[in-house]
Amino acid sequence: MKILIVGAGLVAYGCAYSALQEGYEIYIADHAIEFGLPNVWPSVLLDRQSIPLSFSTDQQFEGVESSFRHEWIMKGMSIELAKLGVKFLHRTRVVSVEELDSNLYQVELTGAGQLNGVHDYNVIINTTQDTWIPWATPHNLSNSSIMYDVERQEAIGYVHLRSQSNEFTNAIYQIDRQDGLSESWYSGNHMTTNRKVIEIISTMLPINHSLWDCSERFQTGMKLWSDRK
């Protein structure tokens, strides 16, 4: 049985991991050249032990304790999932989905990725709400077997020197990274007058702040698959 997951984020990866345990053939499609980049998520990992999939690097680039770089987690997980047989369709957009019967979808794919044209899948999983790619033409997912639905709002993250952390008060998350920098994250249209900000990350994140945590999102993906029946 072939499964297409559209929207490459940690919810998709959790879903893919669970489906792999049941022997399914998994494809993950999205716009990016490398899934996880550019980063639009906080570097928060509160319960690493809850994730059954390895994602560590020998150099520990991804982080330490509860401060783990989201983009490195995605990179490490991509490698592990590929080893397990997941096929990644980078630079790919879903043009159309036609439901032929209850167990078969005909999907047209386009882009500069590995697959183009019309392909058949038994299950379509829409996890695009776990991603934020405003520059890309949206996937046209008129039909899907499973949809990850979450309420989101604007959010903003500041990457700054650790010495400037006291300038960013009332942050939902303030993270001290392994590289010596810090991240401060806020909901809504937050503004700062600090001129020493290194990077500003504008994104859309869940209203439920617990879903900003990488481990929570991976677990949500696993549950999305287990609850499908």
PLM feature spans:
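N-terminal Rossmann-like FAD-binding beta1-loop-alpha1 element of flavoenzymes
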Residues: 1-27, 210, 214-229
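Short, solvent-exposed loop/turn segments at secondary-structure junctions
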Residues: 11, 34, 130-131
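A generic structural signal for short
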Residues: 4, 65-66, 137
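Class I S-adenosyl-L-methionine
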Residues: 17-20, 78, 82
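An acidic- and aromatic-residue-enriched active-site/binding cleft used to recognize and process polar
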Residues: 8, 31-34, 93
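Short beta-strand to alpha-helix junction loop
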Residues: 60-80, 209-212
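Predominantly flavin-linked oxidoreductase catalytic cores and closely associated redox partners
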Residues: 83-199, 203-228
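N-terminal FAD cofactor-binding segment of flavoenzymes
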Residues: 14-63, 70-72
